[in-house]
Amino acid sequence: MKNLCLWLVSLLFFIWVPTASAQTAEAPPPPTPEIPSILTVSEAAIATGMEGLTPQGAADSFESSVGKLYAFTKIAGADEETLVKHHWFHEDQLMAEVELPVRSASWRTYSSKTIAPAMAGQWKVDILSQDGNLLKSIPFTIK
């Protein structure tokens, strides 16, 4: 009797194991890595003023008496809310860092910087993504 029970248990085991493995589904393929959005700067300018979100008096050279300048940026390609940064440099010295929200795939924004008459020289505004990648640099001169 003991041998018969052992034999039945063995038979059930050999029948069950192949059946169970035959019913096992293949593992799903690994998820495709999400391709990050690629931000681009579709428009950028240094200007003496802003009317709404439109730069006024855009140029690449300004008088030292200008008083205040605006760095305008139009961002394309954001598929979720993110940030861009404006880094204002005078003669390669960082003068200001400004974080600006980007809330849609096409977004216009700007920052401003007060310019003292003694700040003549070479300037640039670097536009960076949230993770610090340089998107565009806008050089300009204060005379």
Task: Provide a role label for each language-model segment.
Residues 81, 120-122:
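Extracellular Ig-like/FN3 beta-sandwich strand-entry sites
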Residues 69-76:
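Short edge beta-strand/loop segments characteristic of extracellular beta-sandwich folds
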Residues 107-115:
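Exposed aromatic-hydrophobic patches
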Residues 86-90, 127:
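Conserved aromatic beta-strand anchor motif in extracellular beta-sandwich/beta-rich domains
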Residues 7-17:
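Bacterial N-terminal signal peptides
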Residues 115-116, 124-140:
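Short, exposed beta-strand-loop hairpins at the edges of beta-sheets
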Residues 101-107:
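Short proline/glycine- and polar residue-rich coil/turn motifs
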Residues 24-65:
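Short, compositionally biased P/S/T/A/G/V-rich stretches that sit at domain boundaries
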